[in-house]
């Protein structure tokens, strides 16, 4: 960089842009770590000017969605900016200028928590601890960026933006070598039924990481395989309660962070020093003589458990039935009362109509008599012979009206009680009789179920045990036995949930050790 003429006046800050364009397409392989080291300094001790630097990677994919990624809760957040129409993403976000180049980026805890779901260009960029020192007349700000690159498409543009006077930049980029393969311990057993940990995890998670490489941690704690075996807690026997079923366990007594018995989890993402690992518990063996040789223990069952359950069920159903019956009885009584009112109104209307009809008949008879008297006075015969028509008379039947008056009230003709096989009238109200009927019926039903409960439970237990015994065999892995081994062979049985976990490698899975 050419040396500029200096004056006695206070030098003004000069913006220097350093843009390094690296073609990483040919170098990038799935999951490789590259160390990007950048050092910068000043030729003159600056005490009055603000200096700042920010590192950015210009890519063709917006990563705003990854800011809310649940797999990277503590990873550095991104800020998006557009320069000349192109997106530029900064790690970490700008937080204002500080003196002497002390950026807030040095305080970030950027341990990766990846892989990202759906990442196509890179995985988990994070910063190393920055080193700053005063070297005489130089001010040094050193930053190291680790890039976990995979499936790179296009060109990464690494840009270091510097505010200062005559900056000096040193840039280096090199690949971190892969760590050595772990050594497997010598296991004292003839054979152990086990399964590849990545196969178990991928089948349980239903391929939750379609675009990220799955790897395992090369340094302890590590687990290329897990041990699955059958451990029966208690034996089955006759009784009124369900016995304990056979449970399949994974021994993790050698795992540093977990002790005792532990079921395989679906989310075993562990953060390590230089990468990420999908871990399952390591293999450890258990002496079967201490597990299966002991006599099976049975939990003492309460003899009144079934009776208590039946009575509780009966009381609950009785309360529900009484409440429903009382509500139904009240609604039926209200309906009958309304119908009685309507019936009384109809009877009154019919009687009034009958009375009006009788009055009309009296008027007609009176008019007939008047016409007959008038015709006879004039020297004619009566009305009917004169007009040569038969005489008509109104005859009203009163039998239906009499029967309508003999009707009893509707409440006396309609019963509000349910029709039970046994029905009596002890002078009690309808609600009390209905409650007694409900209680007796449910009590008899509970007694009937108590007599059938042992048979039903026995049939269900035998069916479940039969299904458990039909589990398929599990893949076996052989280990060289030792003469002084105290371990015995484990049973190669496994539940049906592990039947599909054959160690077949998916196309998109890379089982190389994570850097």
Curated annotation (Swiss-Prot):
InterPro entries: TLV/ENV_coat_polyprotein. Disulfide bonds join 212-215, 212-392, 384-391. A motif (CXXC) lies at residues 212-215. Keywords: Cleavage on pair of basic residues, Coiled coil, Disulfide bond, Fusion of virus membrane with host cell membrane, Fusion of virus membrane with host membrane, Glycoprotein, Host cell membrane, Host membrane, Host-virus interaction, Lipoprotein, Membrane, Palmitate, Signal, Transmembrane, Transmembrane helix, Viral attachment to host cell, Viral envelope protein, Viral penetration into host cytoplasm, Virion, Virus entry into host cell. Residues 34-436 are extracellular. Specific enzymatic cleavages in vivo yield mature proteins. Envelope glycoproteins are synthesized as an inactive precursor that is N-glycosylated and processed likely by host cell furin or by a furin-like protease in the Golgi to yield the mature SU and TM proteins. The cleavage site between SU and TM requires the minimal sequence [KR]-X-[KR]-R. A motif (CX6CC) lies at residues 384-392. The keyword Metal-binding does not apply. A lipid is attached at residue 455 (S-palmitoyl cysteine). Residues 330-376, 388-420 form a coiled coil. The record marks 301-302 as: Cleavage. Glycans are attached at residues 129, 203, 230, 251, 256, 271, 287, 351, 398. One of its GO terms (biological process) is symbiont entry into host cell. One of its GO terms (cellular component) is virion membrane. Residues 304-324 are annotated as: Fusion peptide. Residues 1-33 form the signal peptide. Residues 458-515 are cytoplasmic. It holds the Pfam family TLV_coat. Residues 365-381 are annotated as: Immunosuppression. The chain crosses the membrane at residues 437-457. Gene3D superfamilies: 1.10.287.210. PANTHER family: ENDOGENOUS RETROVIRUS GROUP FC1 ENV POLYPROTEIN-RELATED (PTHR10424:SF73), VIRAL ENVELOPE PROTEIN (PTHR10424). The 17 amino acids long immunosuppressive region is present in many retroviral envelope proteins. Synthetic peptides derived from this relatively conserved sequence inhibit immune function in vitro and in vivo. The surface protein (SU) attaches the virus to the host cell by binding to its receptor. This interaction triggers the refolding of the transmembrane protein (TM) and is thought to activate its fusogenic potential by unmasking its fusion peptide. Fusion occurs at the host cell plasma membrane. The mature envelope protein (Env) consists of a trimer of SU-TM heterodimers attached by a labile interchain disulfide bond. This is Envelope glycoprotein.
């Amino acid at each position: 960089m050419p040396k500029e003429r200096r004056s006695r006046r206070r030098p003004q800050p000069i913006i220097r842009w350093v843009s390094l364009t690296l073609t990483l397409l040919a170098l990038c392989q799935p999951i490789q770590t590259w160390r990007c080291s950048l050092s910068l300094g000043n030729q003159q001790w600056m005490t009055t000017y603000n200096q700042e630097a920010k590192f950015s990677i210009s890519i063709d994919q917006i990563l705003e969605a990854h800011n809310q990624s649940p797999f990277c809760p503590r990873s550095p957040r991104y800020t998006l900016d557009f320069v000349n129409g192109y997106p530029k993403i900064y790690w970490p976000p700008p937080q204002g200028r500080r003196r002497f180049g002390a950026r807030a980026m040095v305080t970030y805890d950027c341990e990766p928590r990846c892989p990202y779901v759906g990442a196509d260009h890179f995985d988990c960029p994070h910063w190393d601890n920055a080193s700053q020192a005063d070297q005489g007349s130089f001010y040094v700000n050193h930053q190291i960026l680790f890039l976990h690159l995979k499936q790179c498409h296009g060109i990464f543009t690494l840009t270091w933006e510097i505010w200062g006077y005559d900056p000096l930049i040193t840039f280096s980029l090199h690949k971190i070598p892969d760590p050595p393969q772990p050594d497997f311990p010598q296991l004292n057993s003839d054979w152990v039924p086990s399964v590849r940990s990545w196969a178990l995890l991928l089948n349980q998670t239903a391929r939750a990481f379609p675009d990220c490489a799955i790897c395992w941690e090369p340094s302890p704690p590590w687990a290329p395989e897990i041990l699955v075996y059958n451990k029966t807690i208690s034996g089955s026997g006759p009784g009124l309660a369900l016995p304990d079923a056979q449970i399949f366990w994974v021994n993790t007594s050698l795992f540093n962070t977990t002790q005792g018995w532990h079921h395989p989890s679906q989310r075993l993402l562990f953060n390590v020093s230089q990468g990420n690992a999908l871990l399952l518990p390591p293999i450890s063996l258990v002496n079967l003589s201490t597990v299966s040789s002991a006599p099976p223990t049975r939990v003492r069952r309460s003899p009144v458990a079934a009776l208590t359950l039946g009575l509780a069920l009966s009381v609950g159903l009785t309360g529900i039935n009484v409440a429903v019956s009382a509500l139904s009885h009240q609604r039926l009584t209200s309906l009958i009362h309304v119908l009685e009112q309507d019936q009384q109104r109809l009877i009154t209307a019919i009687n009034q109509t009958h009375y009006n009809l009788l009055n009309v008949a009296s008027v007609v008879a009176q008019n007939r008599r008047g016409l007959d008297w008038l015709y006879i006075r004039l020297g004619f015969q009566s009305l009917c012979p004169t007009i040569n028509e038969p005489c008509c008379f109104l005859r009203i039947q009163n039998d239906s009206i009499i029967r309508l008056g003999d009707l009893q009230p509707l409440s006396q003709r309609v019963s509000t009680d349910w029709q039970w096989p046994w029905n009596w009238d002890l002078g009690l109200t309808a609600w009390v009789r209905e409650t007694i009927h409900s209680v007796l019926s449910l009590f008899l039903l509970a007694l009937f179920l108590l007599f059938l409960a042992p048979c039903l439970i026995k049939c269900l237990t035998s069916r479940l045990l039969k299904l458990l015994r039909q589990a398929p065999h599990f893949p076996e892995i052989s280990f060289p036995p030792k003469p002084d081994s105290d371990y015995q062979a484990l049973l190669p049985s496994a539940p049906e949930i592990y039947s599909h976990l054959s160690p077949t490698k998916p196309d998109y899975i890379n089982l190389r050790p994570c850097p």
